[in-house]
Curated annotation (Swiss-Prot):
<feature type="domain" description="IQ 3">
    <location>
        <begin position="956"/>
        <end position="978"/>
    </location>
</feature>
<dbReference type="GO" id="GO:0005634">
    <property type="term" value="C:nucleus"/>
</dbReference>
<keyword id="KW-0217">Developmental protein</keyword>
<keyword id="KW-0677">Repeat</keyword>
<keyword id="KW-0225">Disease variant</keyword>
<dbReference type="GO" id="GO:0007286">
    <property type="term" value="P:spermatid development"/>
</dbReference>
<feature type="region of interest" description="Disordered">
    <location>
        <begin position="34"/>
        <end position="78"/>
    </location>
</feature>
<feature type="region of interest" description="Disordered">
    <location>
        <begin position="283"/>
        <end position="324"/>
    </location>
</feature>
<feature type="domain" description="IQ 2">
    <location>
        <begin position="926"/>
        <end position="955"/>
    </location>
</feature>
<dbReference type="InterPro" id="IPR000048">
    <property type="entry name" value="IQ_motif_EF-hand-BS"/>
</dbReference>
<feature type="domain" description="IQ 6">
    <location>
        <begin position="1143"/>
        <end position="1165"/>
    </location>
</feature>
<dbReference type="InterPro" id="IPR052318">
    <property type="entry name" value="CellDiv_DevSignal_Domain"/>
</dbReference>
<feature type="domain" description="IQ 4">
    <location>
        <begin position="979"/>
        <end position="1001"/>
    </location>
</feature>
<feature type="domain" description="IQ 5">
    <location>
        <begin position="1113"/>
        <end position="1142"/>
    </location>
</feature>
<comment type="subunit">
    <text>Interacts with calmodulin.</text>
</comment>
<dbReference type="InterPro" id="IPR027417">
    <property type="entry name" value="P-loop_NTPase"/>
</dbReference>
<feature type="region of interest" description="Disordered">
    <location>
        <begin position="476"/>
        <end position="496"/>
    </location>
</feature>
C-alpha cells in the first residue's frame, strides 16, 4: 500500500467512523468486540484512558453533541486506529477471504475423509462380493466334481486304460538315480489296483518284484518300482498261452488280503487246469530259496502245466476208450493228422472167460485160437462207454486190450472158455471180422462140399452202443465136447438161408481154394450142438473198453481138409442157412493151434504181386467178419468123389436192420480167388441206416437191456442157431447179411469211409480181378426184388434217401413190397450182390416168422434146389418175439409200388406210439406250419398297422374338428357382436325417434295453441288423442332419470296432472340381462282446469326443451372423456415407471459388474476434482 493510500485511508477514517456511528451503530455496538492489543504503546495507553462508551451513553452524547463540541473533538481524537482498521472494508474483505479459505480447507478435509470412507466401503463390498462369488463357484465346482467323478473314472478307464499310472513322487527332494525306473510302470488303476494285461505276455525271462519278499527287493517302494526287476530269472510265457496270476496289493507286500486277481483269456487248452488252480488259490506266497531267487506256486504250477497238456487232453479219450484196460496207451487228438497208412500192430489180449448159462456142464477146457486175420489197419481211438466223438487217427502202438466178461443166455451148454482173440475195433462203422468156421451135424443133403473163405473178410454190421464194440476175432466157436473153431449147430426148421450160390466153375474153384486155405490144419470137429446165439470168439464178442484193431502180421490160415458133415446155420434174422460138408477132423479135443498160421500158403498164393499192400491196406476203417454159414437145402454139391471137395458157401454179411426190417443177406465170394474187397465202391463199410445220423452203433442197440452183443445174439430159445453175426436187437430187427443205410439223409456210412479207403484196395487179397459190388438192379429178377425191396432200409427212411443211394455200374433199384416171402436173390439199395451171381435164377424160400409151421413156399426158380424137409418146421414164438413180431411181419404180401411206401408213414413194430412220416409228408407239414406262422404274423402286422392308422385318423379328426369349432366360434362371436351392435343401434335410434316425436316443440306448441283457441273439451280430447299418447319409460340398470318423468313428477303447490303407473309390461335390459318394470304415464295434459292445465304442461315442456340441453350433454361427454383419458394416462405412466425401474436395475447391475473388473472404477480417478462425478451412478 502506498503512502498516499495510507493518508487517504487515515483521512477517511473519520468519515467512515461517522457513517458507521450513524448508520451501523447498532451493528458496532452489537459486536462489542474487544480490539486486540495494539502494536504501539501509545495506543495501549489511550485505550486504557478511554474505556468503551456504552450505547445509551453514545445516544446521549449524540443528542448533546452540539452542546459539547469540545468534548466530541477530544473523543474522536481518542478513537484508536486499530478499530478503524478492523471496521474497514478491506479488513472485512480479508476476513471473508480467510473464511473462504478455511471453508475450502474444511470442505477438502471433509471430502477427503468422505471419499476415503466411501472407497473403503466400496472395497469392502467388492471384496465381500468377490468372496461370495468365489465361495459359490467352489461349492458348485465341488458338487460337479463329486457328481461326475464316477462317470469320469469310468470314461478314463475306457479311453485311457493304457496310460500308465505314476504314483506320487517327491521330485524335488529325490535323488536323480532313484527317479529312474528300471522298467515300464505297471498299468494300474488307482482305485481298483488292477494291473494291465499287456505286461503278462513276455518275450524274455523276467521276474516280478511283486512276487519277491521285501528282502529281495531292497528298499520297499512298491509304488515307484516297476513290476519287473532286471537280472532276475522269472517266468517265461509262451506267446499263445496265458497264466492267471494273483498279484498282491502294490502298497504292501505283506497284505493279509490280496484284492486283485489278474485273469487273462485262456487261448490254449493246455492251461485250463492252471486257470482252475489259480482261481482256487487264495493267496500267492513267495518263497526265496538259497540263491535268493523267487520260487512261487505259480512257477511250480506252470512247470506242472507244461507237462500236463498231454495228460489233460488225453484224459477224456482214455476214459472213453479203455475204462477197464489199464495198459492201453494211445496218443490223444493232439496228434497231427496224417494220411491213412496201415501199421501192423500186434495186440496183446488178455484171456478172459465167457461164462454162459448152459444146460449141460462140461469141464472147462482151453483152446488156443490162431489169428486168422490178414487185416492191416491202423489202430483207431474211439469213445467207449462215454459218447465221446473223436476224429479217426492212426495209432501205431501195440495195445493191451482186456475183454470184458459177457454172459450168454443160451440153453445149449458151453463151458467156460478162454478165447484169446485178435481184436480190431473201429470208431463209427463198428463191424466184426468173424473168421469162425462152423461145422454141423451130418445132414441129409449129400455131396461133400469144401467151402473156402478168403482171408479177406466181409463187412458185417453188428449193433453196438457204447460198450458193444465188435472186435476182429479169429477165434473158433467152442462147444461142450470140442475145442475147435468149427462150431456144430443144429439148424432150425423155420430159418432159411437167403444166399446165392455161384454156378461158374471158376467161381467154385476160387471158393474151394479159399476154404482149403482156411481149413488146412483145422482139428477134428465133433458133432455137438452149439448155442444158437452164443457170442463165441468166432462171433461178435463184446468189449466194454476201447478196442483197437490189431491185425497180426502173419497170415493165419485154417484148412479144413475133410468135411464129413453138413453144417446148417440158422438165424432168426434170416441168416445164411446152409449145409456145409466138411471132412472129419482127426483131433476132436484140440482147437486150431497157433502154428497153423505158419503153414505154407503156396496153393492159395495170389499172383498179383501186391501182398504187402494187401497186408497193410486190408481194413477199410471197419471191422469185417467172415461168416461161413451152412447152405440150406438149395445148396448144390458141384463135385464129389476124388475131386477136392468144394462147397458152395454163401459168405454172408450180417447187417443190422433196426425197426423190424427184413434183409436178405446175399453176398458171395469173389471170382478168381478174390473175395469181394469192395475196392470199386466205398461200400466196404456196412451202410447202416439207423435213426442216429452217422452213428450206427448208437441206434442199433437202443435199449439198456441189450447191453451186450452176446445177449443180443442169444435171444433165441433152445433152437440151435449159428450166432455168427446174427444179432437180435430189442426192436426185433434181425441181423441180416446185407447193407443197411444210415438215416443221414441218404448218405451211407460208406461215403464217410470213402476217404479212408486207399486207392489201392483192389489188391487187398492179392487178387488179379476186382470184385464188383453191385447193388440190386435190373439184372436181378424183378419179382424177387419186389418181395424184398422194402427191407433193405428202415421203413421210416425217406424216399429221397432211398433214391439217392449210390448205384454203381448203372444199376437201378428194383421195386419193393411190404412183406411176404422174399427170395434171397434180390436186394434193394445198399445190399451187396455178388458179381458172380447168375441173374434171374438164384432165389430162396423165405418164410414169415412165427407162422407156426405154415410154410408159404415160393415156386422155385429154374436152377433152384428143393429145400429139405427139416428146413421147414414149427417156429417157436419166443424165438422171434411173440405175436407182436408176427403181427409186424404178417402184413399183406401183395406187391406194392415204391410210391405206396413213399406216401404213407410206416410205424415200426416197437414204436407203434411214435408214427414216422415220410419226407413228403414231413415237407407238407413244414409247409403248412410255415403258412400258419406266416398267416399269424401277417395278421398281427395288419392289425397293428390298422390300429396305428386308426390312432392317426383319430388324432387328425380331433385336430380338424377342434380347428373347425374354434373357427366357427370366432365366426359366431363376430356375428353375435354384429347382431348385438345392430340391434343396439336400432334400439337407440328408435328410442331417440320416439323421444323426439313425443317432446318435439312443434307438437307442444300446436297442442298449446289449440288448447288456447278451442274451449270445447271434446275437441281437445280428440286433438289429444291424435297428438298425445301414453308415456312409457323403461327402467334400466343405468342410473339416469327420464326428462319427461322428471318434469311430470309432482311438486309442492302444483295440482296432480298425470297418473304414473309402475310395473306394467316389463322388459329385459340388454345391458345387464335383468327384467325391469316399465313406467307408464297416463293422463298427460289433463287437469282440473282444462285450458290452464294444458298451458302449464306445455309451458313446462317448453322449458324442459331449452337450448341448454345439448350443451349439458356435451359437457357431460367432455367430463367423461377427460376422466377416461386421465385414467389411461395414469395407467400408462405407471407402466412406464415400472419399465424404467427394471431398466435402471439392469443397468446398475451391469455397471457394478464392470466396475469389479476395472481398477479405475474400483478405486476412483486420481483427480480429486472429478470425484463428484463418480459419487453418483454414471449414465443415470
Amino acid at each position: 500500500m502506498t503512502l498516499q493510500g495510507r493518508a487517504d485511508l487515515s483521512g477517511n477514517q473519520g468519515n467512515a467512523a461517522g457513517r458507521l456511528a450513524t448508520v451501523h451503530e447498532p451493528v458496532v455496538t452489537q459486536w462489542a468486540v474487544h480490539p486486540p492489543a495494539p502494536a504501539h504503546p501509545s495506543l495501549l495507553d489511550k485505550m486504557e484512558k478511554a474505556p468503551p462508551q456504552p450505547q445509551h451513553e453514545g445516544l446521549k452524547s449524540k443528542e448533546h453533541l452540539p452542546q459539547q463540541p469540545a468534548e466530541g473533538k477530544t473523543a474522536s481524537r481518542r478513537v484508536p486506529r486499530l478499530r478503524a482498521v478492523v471496521e474497514s472494508q478491506a479488513f472485512k474483505n480479508i476476513l471473508v477471504d480467510e473464511m473462504d479459505m478455511m471453508h475450502a480447507r474444511a470442505a477438502t478435509l471433509i471430502q477427503a475423509n468422505w471419499r476415503g470412507y466411501w472407497l473403503r466401503q466400496k472395497l469392502i463390498s467388492q471384496m465381500m462380493a468377490a468372496k461370495a462369488i468365489q465361495e459359490a463357484w467352489r461349492r458348485f465346482n465341488k458338487r460337479h466334481i463329486l457328481h461326475s467323478s464316477k462317470s469320469l473314472v469310468k470314461k478314463t478307464r475306457a479311453e485311457e486304460g493304457d496310460i500308465p499310472y505314476h504314483a506320487p513322487q517327491q521330485v524335488r527332494f529325490q535323488h536323480p538315480e532313484e527317479n529312474r525306473l528300471l522298467s515300464p510302470p505297471i498299468m494300474v488303476n488307482k482305485e481298483t489296483q488292477f494291473p494291465s494285461c499287456d505286461n503278462l505276455v513276455l518275450c524274455r525271462p523276467q521276474s516280478s518284484p511283486l512276487l519277491q519278499p521285501p528282502a529281495a527287493q531292497g528298499t520297499p517302494e512298491p509304488c515307484v518300482q516297476g513290476p519287473h526287476a532286471a537280472r532276475v530269472r522269472g517266468l517265461a510265457f509262451l506267446p499263445h498261452q496265458t497264466v492267471t496270476i494273483r498279484f498282491p496289493c502294490p502298497v504292501s507286500l505283506d497284505a493279509k488280503c490280496q484284492p486283485c486277481l489278474l485273469t487273462r483269456t485262456i487261448r490254449s487248452t493246455c492251461l485250463v487246469h492252471i486257470e482252475g488252480d489259480s482261481v482256487k488259490t487264495k493267496r500267492v506266497s513267495a518263497r526265496t530259496n538259497k540263491a535268493r531267487a523267487p520260487e512261487t506256486p505259480l512257477s511250480r504250477r506252470y512247470d506242472q502245466a507244461v507237462t500236463r497238456p498231454s495228460r489233460a487232453q488225453t484224459q477224456g479219450p482214455v476214459k472213453a476208450e479203455t475204462p477197464k484196460a489199464p495198459f492201453q496207451i494211445c496218443p490223444g487228438p493232439m496228434i497231427t493228422k496224417t494220411l491213412l497208412q496201415t501199421y501192423p500192430v500186434v495186440s496183446v489180449t488178455l484171456p478172459q472167460t465167457y461164462p454162459a448159462s448152459t444146460m449141460t456142464t462140461t469141464p472147462p477146457k482151453t483152446s488156443p485160437v490162431p489169428k486168422v486175420t490178414i487185416i492191416k489197419t491202423p489202430a483207431q481211438m474211439y469213445p467207449g462207454p462215454t459218447v465221446t466223438k473223436t476224429a479217426p487217427h492212426t495209432c501205431p502202438m501195440p495195445t493191451m486190450t482186456k475183454i470184458q466178461v459177457h454172459p450168454t443166455a443160451s440153453r445149449t451148454g458151453t463151458p467156460r472158455q478162454t478165447c484169446p482173440a485178435t481184436i480190431t475195433a473201429k470208431n463209427r462203422p463198428q463191424v466184426s471180422l468173424l473168421a469162425s468156421i462152423m461145422k454141423s451135424l451130418p445132414q441129409v443133403c449129400p455131396g461133400p462140399a469144401m467151402a473156402k473163405t478168403p482171408p479177406q473178410m466181409h463187412p458185417v454190421t453188428t449193433p453196438a452202443k457204447n460198450p458193444l464194440q465188435t472186435c476182429l476175432s479169429a477165434t473158433m466157436s467152442k462147444t461142450s465136447s470140442q475145442r475147435s473153431p468149427v462150431g456144430v449147430t443144429k439148424p432150425s426148421p423155420q430159418t432159411r438161408l437167403p444166399a446165392m450160390i455161384t454156378k461158374t466153375p471158376a467161381q467154385l474153384r476160387s471158393v474151394a481154394t479159399i476154404l482149403k486155405t482156411l481149413c488146412l490144419a483145422s482139428p477134428t470137429v465133433a458133432n455137438v450142438k452149439a448155442p444158437p446165439q452164443v457170442a463165441v470168439a468166432a462171433g461178435t464178442p463184446n468189449t466194454s473198453g476201447s478196442i483197437h484193431e490189431n491185425p497180426p502180421k502173419a497170415k493165419a490160415t485154417v484148412n479144413v481138409k475133410q468135411a464129413a458133415k453138413v453144417v446148417k446155420a440158422s438165424s432168426p434174422s434170416y441168416l445164411a442157412e446152409g449145409k456145409i460138408r466138411c471132412l472129419a477132423q482127426p483131433h476132436p479135443g484140440t482147437g486150431v493151434p497157433r502154428a497153423a498160421a505158419e503153414l505154407p500158403l503156396e496153393a492159395e498164393k495170389i499172383k498179383t504181386g501186391t501182398q504187402k499192400q494187401a497186408k497193410t491196406d486190408m481194413a477199410f476203417k471197419t471191422s469185417v467178419a467172415v461168416e461161413m454159414a451152412g447152405a440150406p437145402s438149395w445148396t448144390k454139391v458141384a463135385e464129389e468123389g476124388d475131386k477136392p471137395p468144394h462147397v458152395y458157401v454163401p459168405v454172408d454179411m450180417a447187417v443190422t436192420l433196426p425197426r423190424g426190417q427184413l434183409a436178405a443177406p446175399l453176398t458171395n465170394a469173389s471170382s478168381q480167388r478174390h473175395p469181394p474187397c469192395l475196392s470199386q465202391r466205398p461200400l466196404a463199410a456196412p451202410l447202416t441206416k439207423a435213426s442216429s445220423q452217422g452213428h450206427l452203433p448208437t441206434e442199433l442197440t437202443k435199449t439198456p437191456s441189450l447191453a451186450h452183443l452176446d445177449t443180443c445174439l442169444s435171444k433165441m430159445h433152445s433152437q440151435t442157431h449159428l450166432a455168427t453175426g446174427a444179432v437180435k436187437v430189442q426192436s426185433q430187427a434181425p441181423l441180416a447179411t446185407c447193407l443197411t443205410k444210415t438215416q443221414s439223409r441218404g448218405q451211407p456210412i460208406t461215403d464217410i469211409t470213402t476217404c479212408l479207403i486207399p486207392a489201392h484196395q483192389a489188391a487187398d487179397l492179392s487178387s488179379n480181378t476186382h470184385s464188383q459190388v453191385l447193388l440190386t438192379g435190373s439184372k436181378v429178377s424183378n419179382h424177387a426184388c419186389q418181395r424184398l425191396g422194402g427191407l433193405s432200409a428202415p421203413p421210416w427212411a425217406k424216399p429221397e434217401d432211398r433214391q439217392t443211394q449210390p448205384q454203381p455200374h448203372g444199376h437201378v433199384p428194383g421195386k419193393t413190397t411190404q412183406g411176404g416171402p422174399c427170395p434171397a436173390a434180390c436186394e434193394v439199395q445198399g445190399m451187396l450182390v455178388p458179381p458172380m451171381a447168375p441173374t434171374g435164377h438164384s432165389t430162396c424160400n423165405v418164410e414169415s416168422w412165427g407162422d407156426n409151421g405154415a410154410t408159404r413156399a415160393q415156386p422155385s426158380m429154374p436152377g433152384q434146389a428143393v429145400p429139405c424137409q427139416e428146413d421147414t418146421g414149427p417156429a417157436d414164438a419166443g424165438v422171434v418175439g411173440g405175436q407182436s413180431w408176427n403181427r409186424a411181419w404178417e402184413p399183406a404180401r401183395g406187391a406194392a409200388s415204391w410210391d405206396t411206401w413213399r406216401n404213407k408213414a410206416v410205424v415200426p413194430p416197437r414204436r407203434s406210439g411214435e408214427p414216422m412220416v415220410s419226407m413228403q409228408a414231413a415237407e407238407e407239414i413244414r409247409i403248412l406250419a410255415v403258412i400258419t406262422i406266416q398267416a399269424g404274423v401277417r395278421g398281427y402286422l395288419a392289425r397293428r398297422r390298422i390300429r396305428l392308422w386308426h390312432r392317426g385318423a383319430m388324432v387328425i379328426q380331433a385336430t380338424w374338428r377342434g380347428y373347425r369349432v374354434r373357427r366357427n366360434l370366432a365366426h359366431l362371436c363376430r356375428a353375435t357382436t354384429t347382431i348385438q351392435s345392430a340391434w343396439r343401434g336400432y334400439s337407440t335410434r328408435r328410442d331417440q325417434a320416439r323421444h323426439w316425436q313425443m317432446l318435439h316443440p312443434v307438437t307442444w306448441v300446436e297442442l298449446g295453441s289449440r288448447a288456447g283457441v278451442m274451449s270445447d273439451r271434446s275437441w281437445f280430447q280428440d286433438g289429444r288423442a291424435r297428438t298425445v299418447s301414453d308415456h312409457r319409460c323403461f327402467q334400466s340398470c343405468q342410473a339416469h332419470a327420464c326428462s319427461v318423468c322428471h318434469s311430470l313428477s309432482s311438486r309442492i303447490g302444483s295440482p296432480p296432472s298425470v297418473v304414473m303407473l309402475v310395473g306394467s309390461s316389463p322388459r329385459t335390459c340388454h345391458t345387464c340381462g335383468r327384467t325391469q318394470p316399465t313406467r307408464v304415464v297416463q293422463g298427460m295434459g289433463q287437469g282440473t282446469e282444462g285450458p290452464g292445465a294444458v298451458s302449464w304442461a306445455s309451458a313446462y315442456q317448453l322449458a324442459a326443451l331449452s337450448p341448454r340441453q345439448p350443451h349439458r350433454q356435451d359437457k357431460a361427454a367432455t367430463a367423461i372423456q377427460s376422466a377416461w383419458r386421465g385414467f389411461k394416462i395414469r395407467q400408462q405412466m405407471r407402466q412406464q415407471q415400472m419399465a424404467a425401474k427394471i431398466v435402471q436395475a439392469t443397468w446398475r447391475g451391469h455397471h457394478t459388474r464392470s466396475c469389479l473388473k476395472n481398477t479405475e472404477a474400483l478405486l476412483g480417478p486420481a483427480d480429486p476434482s472429478a470425484s463428484s462425478r463418480h459419487m453418483h451412478w454414471p449414465g443415470i
